[in-house]
Amino acid sequence: MAFLKKSLFLVLFLGLVPLFLCENEKREGENEKEENDDQSEEKRSLGSFMKGVGKGLATVGKIVADQFGKLLEAGKG
């Protein structure tokens, strides 16, 4: 009977150790995926910011061009 208990314990132990190792690897993989998601979110945020800056500069450029055009017309007349 003691032999069966030891065998059962050994089987359970050998079954749980790989399970534990697999779960650790799975957690590490999930953490890496979350880090990659965070980095891609930061890149998207930066892209949105740059897009907004570009639109703002375009608007300012139009205003400056209009004002410069008015100054040139006033100087001719």
UniProtKB/Swiss-Prot annotation:
Q: In which tissues is it expressed?
A: Expressed by the skin glands.
InterPro entries noted in UniProt? Frog_antimicrobial_propeptide (IPR004275), FSAP (IPR016322)
UniProt keywords, alphabetically: Amidation, Amphibian defense peptide, Antibiotic, Antimicrobial, Cleavage on pair of basic residues, Secreted, Signal
User: Some GO term, biological process aspect, for this entry: which one?
Assistant: defense response to bacterium
Q: Which GO terms describe its cellular component?
A: extracellular region
Annotated localization: Secreted
Coiled coil where?
none
Residues of the propeptide region, as annotated, are 23-42
Q: Which residues carry this modification: Lysine amide?
A: 76
Q: Which residues form the signal peptide?
A: 1-22
Q: What is its main location?
A: secreted
| Record's keyword annotation contains Nucleotide-binding | no
The family classification in the record reads: Belongs to the frog skin active peptide (FSAP) family. Dermatoxin subfamily.
| Role, per record | Possesses a potent antimicrobial activity against Gram-positive and Gram-negative bacteria. Probably acts by disturbing membrane functions with its amphipathic structure.
Official protein name in the record: Dermatoxin-DA1
Q: Native species of this protein?
A: Agalychnis dacnicolor
